[in-house]
Amino acid sequence: MRRFIQWCTVIGLLLGLVPLAQAQGSYPDRPIRFVVAFPPGGATDTFFRLISNELGTALGQSIVIENKGGAGGYIAWQMVAAAPADGYTVLVAENAIGINQALFKKHPSGFNPLKDYDAVGAMGSVPVVWTVANNVPANSFPEFVQWSKTVPGHFNYGHAGPGSVSHLVPEVILDGAGMQAVPVPFKGGGPAAQAVAGGFVAVVVSSLAVAKPQMEGKLVKGLLVTSAKRSPAIPEVPTLKELGIKVADVDLEFWWGLFVPKGSPEPIRAKIEKALQATMSNPVVRDRLAKVDTDPSYAPGPALTAKLEREITNWSKFIDAKGIKVEQ
């Protein structure tokens, strides 16, 4: 009798695994929601829309992009972390997810990207551009530094929210150039970029993909790019090295990766990763990204996790050294 009960238990467990295996085998059988933690028009939204069609083709399913801005990214990050771990809700993250962790240390919500997510893969990076409003009387970065001395501590820069790339990268450049400024938060990189174009703030650091069309339209002036050498997309803009600005050892760029809720089935995570790898090696995608000097570099999940860990460590050193704090 005892053996009979044991066999029934085993059979019950095996039968319970059948629907799960079938679900994993048929994945994806409905549209997949990819969540961007910032409003349309920002760096992450712009980048992902450049690759989303090909990623959907590689997955064999439609992609639905959902922009869920607010709280510097935390609303979306927590929402996706709490979603069912079934592969149908994926986070499109930028390095702000690591910078925030370095800035806030322990968020009141308890959110921690290393504990709450499984990394799918890295999918590219792009340098950022120091863009200034047309009403700022400077046409080069040295001229901008000289102008800043006439308004010490009083010029402002817009950013996408506390802990965002456009919040902390300017602080690194300001530190290296010996300037001070007042940060002005917006609800995303798109609104911040619109603000500098309208002359409402003096500076915004934008991804090259966002800055280039603004520069071509004479809406802003690009005075500095954070790439190691001049970008072919904006060859007239000098680099930090050319300008003699020494900065902290942090990534002065946007980089992106896909994450799924912790505990997502490995076969499903692997399918998304395989589709991402195929997308980033697609010649059409690579050519499209090259036009905005975006490196379509793919890296697997473990490499993305390691990159996120380094990001948190390096930014923590800079933030702690400079005593940067933001009210939570």
Region annotations inferred by a language model:
Residues A23-D116, G153-H154, P162, S166, ...:
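N-terminal (or domain-start) structured segment
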Residues D29-P31, D175-M179, E242, E266-Q328:
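An extracytoplasmic/periplasmic, membrane-proximal ligand-sensing/linker region
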Residues M79-Y88, Q101-P191, L240-E242, W255-R288:
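Hinge/capping helix and adjacent helix->loop/strand transition within the periplasmic-binding protein
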